[in-house]
From Swiss-Prot:
Top-level taxonomy: Bacteria, Pseudomonadati, Pseudomonadota, Gammaproteobacteria, Enterobacterales
Biological function: Toxic component of a type I toxin-antitoxin (TA) system. When overexpressed kills cells within 2 minutes; causes collapse of the transmembrane potential and arrest of respiration.
Family: Belongs to the Hok/Gef family.
Disulfide bonds, paired cysteine numbers: none
Alphabetic keyword roster: Cell inner membrane, Cell membrane, Membrane, Toxin-antitoxin system, Transmembrane, Transmembrane helix
Membrane-protein topology: Single-pass membrane protein
Organism: Escherichia coli (strain K12)
InterPro entries, alphabetized: Hok/gef_toxin, Hok/gef_toxin_CS
The protein's name: Toxic protein HokD
Amino acid sequence: MKQQKAMLIALIVICLTVIVTALVTRKDLCEVRIRTGQTEVAVFTAYEPEE
Protein backbone atom coordinates (compact mmCIF):
# COMPACT_ATOMS: atom_id res chain seq x y z
CA MET A 1 0.00 0.00 0.00
CA LYS A 2 2.80 2.44 0.86
CA GLN A 3 4.59 1.65 -2.41
CA GLN A 4 1.43 2.45 -4.41
CA LYS A 5 1.02 5.73 -2.56
CA ALA A 6 4.66 6.64 -3.19
CA MET A 7 4.30 5.82 -6.90
CA LEU A 8 1.14 7.94 -7.12
CA ILE A 9 2.90 10.89 -5.47
CA ALA A 10 5.86 10.48 -7.84
CA LEU A 11 3.52 10.44 -10.85
CA ILE A 12 1.76 13.59 -9.64
CA VAL A 13 5.10 15.36 -9.13
CA ILE A 14 6.26 14.38 -12.63
CA CYS A 15 3.00 15.58 -14.21
CA LEU A 16 3.12 18.88 -12.34
CA THR A 17 6.74 19.38 -13.38
CA VAL A 18 5.87 18.83 -17.04
CA ILE A 19 2.92 21.23 -16.86
CA VAL A 20 4.90 23.96 -15.09
CA THR A 21 7.79 23.59 -17.54
CA ALA A 22 5.39 23.88 -20.47
CA LEU A 23 3.75 26.97 -18.94
CA VAL A 24 7.10 28.65 -18.35
CA THR A 25 8.57 27.92 -21.79
CA ARG A 26 5.45 28.29 -23.96
CA LYS A 27 3.05 31.16 -24.46
CA ASP A 28 0.17 28.69 -24.82
CA LEU A 29 -0.45 25.00 -24.36
CA CYS A 30 -2.20 24.34 -27.70
CA GLU A 31 0.93 22.72 -29.08
CA VAL A 32 3.76 21.14 -27.15
CA ARG A 33 6.63 19.29 -28.83
CA ILE A 34 9.36 17.39 -27.00
CA ARG A 35 12.34 16.10 -28.97
CA THR A 36 14.86 13.63 -27.64
CA GLY A 37 17.36 12.37 -30.19
CA GLN A 38 15.37 10.77 -32.98
CA THR A 39 12.12 10.63 -30.99
CA GLU A 40 9.57 13.44 -31.05
CA VAL A 41 6.40 13.63 -28.97
CA ALA A 42 3.83 16.20 -30.10
CA VAL A 43 0.69 17.06 -28.16
CA PHE A 44 -2.02 19.22 -29.72
CA THR A 45 -5.12 20.58 -28.04
CA ALA A 46 -8.12 21.45 -30.19
CA TYR A 47 -10.92 23.46 -28.68
CA GLU A 48 -13.72 25.77 -29.70
CA PRO A 49 -14.68 28.67 -27.46
CA GLU A 50 -18.28 28.80 -26.29
CA GLU A 51 -20.38 31.67 -27.57
